[in-house]
């Protein structure tokens, strides 16, 4: 490959770091510039709501790579570099402050940002004790607000909200979770798993309120701290919930503004194909900022997960280096709450049957999601071996018998064998 060709990677999260390193490994011979908009060296984000927030992991353990790894790979890492504009015609990236960089190929790994709370009480700006969680600094700010006896109100009962709730309980805080939907984790899992996790949190002393709409914040004077969250409950009654700290986890917005301003095709994310290529032949994109057409599910999807970021980054690197290998990986996710590990593969949306295998009481089980008898997704709690078998089986579109699937006396491996393998057995 031409040693004069320059690859510029915008975004130094999981996708950006993986893409830069993979491009070098797959033969990119020219300069590689990795631009991160934070002052911190690239770091793992999942622990921010878990071990790092709970004080069980130090900042020094968060790094995605040692600094020497970038130097060894000949990657120039530039921190605190925020991109203002992309000129596709000139192949130039302009940073805030006016510095310009020429690229031969460009990778957009811009990630996402928290969806902001928009209710009365926010007009004077973000209160000092109201937090979002996306960065290391965000996690540090939350940890500083959470102490034994403080009352923490978590707005949002998704992954982030429940993980923050679990970590806050470990730190001794009194925690209330407010979820607008009728159940927690409503966007990502089925009724049974939602009920299980609500029970887990309530058993740990968390007050979980579902079907609740936040109607406003009460502040200590104009521009002061939040002292209460006002809500409308499922019965239509208005309530005032005192709060020492508020953490908002109501979703994420993809950072697509640079791509959109540059004229790239977008649709709730930067549109990429199975090689992570965009509508511009000289630009790829990977991670939370993208959408792609899923072969497995037959629709356009946007995934917010580290595994997807890594798989897309590797596909992008291969494409850039003339070694295309399409990304056809199964979507999967994980969440650590208390002593439980939830692993999820596939997308359960649209399922018409949920089969439980294992012991809910013993907190080691799987929820298999079927649509028309065909396996489309699985959630596993403290059942890693069953999870891996099911994850591998998802691309096979297996038709499964629900009764057999629920019967733990029947080996799962025999049920999930592809038809050809089953015939040989």
Model-predicted regions and their roles:
Residues 1-10, 64-153, 229-237, 247-249, ...:
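FAD-binding core/adjacent interface of flavoenzyme oxidoreductases
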Residues 2-6, 12, 25, 289-388:
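Mid-to-C-terminal Rossmann-like scaffold of FAD/NAD(P)H-dependent oxidoreductases
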Residues 2-76, 167-188, 389:
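Beta1-alpha1 glycine-rich phosphate/pyrophosphate-binding loop at the start
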Residues 6, 239-265, 340-420:
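C-terminal catalytic lobe of FAD-dependent flavoproteins
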Residues 13-16, 158-161, 317:
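Catalytic nucleophile loop
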Residues 14, 39, 112-114, 137, ...:
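Residue-level detector of alpha-helix initiation sites
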Residues 29-31, 71, 77-94, 101, ...:
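A Rossmann-like FAD-binding core segment of flavoenzymes
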Residues 125-149, 221, 225-228, 240-315:
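FAD-site-proximal beta/loop scaffold in flavoenzymes
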């Amino acid at each position: 490959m031409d040693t004069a060709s320059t690859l510029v990677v915008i975004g130094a999260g999981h996708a950006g770091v993986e893409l830069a390193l993979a491009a070098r490994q797959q033969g990119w011979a020219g300069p590689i510039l990795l631009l991160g908009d934070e002052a911190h060296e690239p770091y793992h984000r999942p622990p921010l709501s878990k071990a790092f927030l709970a004080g069980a992991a130090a900042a020094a353990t968060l790094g995605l790579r040692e600094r020497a790894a970038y130097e060894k790979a000949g990657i120039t890492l530039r921190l605190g570099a925020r991109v203002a504009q992309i000129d596709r015609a000139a192949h130039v990236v302009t940073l805030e402050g006016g510095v310009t960089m020429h690229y031969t190929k460009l990778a957009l790994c811009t990630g996402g940002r928290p969806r902001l709370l928009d209710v009365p009480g926010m007009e004077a700006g973000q209160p000092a004790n109201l937090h979002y969680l996306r960065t290391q600094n965000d996690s540090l700010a939350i940890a500083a607000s959470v102490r034994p006896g403080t009352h923490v109100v978590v707005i949002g009962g998704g992954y982030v909200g429940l993980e923050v709730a679990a970590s806050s309980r470990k730190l001794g805080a009194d925690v209330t979770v407010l979820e607008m939907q009728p159940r927690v984790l409503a966007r990502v899992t089925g009724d049974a798993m939602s009920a299980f996790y609500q029970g887990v949190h309530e058993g740990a002393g968390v007050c979980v309120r579902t079907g609740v709409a936040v109607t406003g914040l009460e502040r200590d004077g104009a521009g002061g701290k939040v002292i209460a969250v006002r809500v409308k409950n499922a019965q239509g009654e208005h309530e005032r919930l005192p709060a020492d700290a508020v953490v908002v986890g109501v979703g994420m917005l993809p950072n697509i503004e640079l791509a959109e301003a540059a004229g790239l095709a977008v649709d709730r994310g930067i549109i990429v194909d199975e090689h992570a290529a965009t509508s511009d032949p000289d630009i790829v994109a990977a991670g939370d900022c993208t959408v792609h057409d899923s072969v497995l599910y037959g629709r356009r999807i946007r995934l917010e997960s580290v595994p997807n970021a890594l798989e897309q980054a590797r596909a992008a690197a291969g494409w850039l280096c003339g070694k295309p290998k399409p990304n056809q990986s199964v979507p999967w996710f994980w969440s650590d709450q208390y002593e439980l590990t939830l692993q999820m593969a596939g997308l359960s949306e649209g399922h018409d049957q949920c089969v439980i295998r294992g012991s809910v009481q013993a907190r080691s089980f799987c929820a298999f999601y079927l649509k028309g008898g065909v396996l489309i997704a699985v959630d596993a709690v403290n059942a890693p071996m069953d999870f891996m078998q099911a994850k591998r089986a998802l691309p096979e579109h297996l038709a499964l018998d629900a009764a057999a699937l629920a019967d733990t006396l029947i080996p799962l491996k025999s049920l999930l064998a592809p038809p050809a393998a089953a015939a040989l057995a």
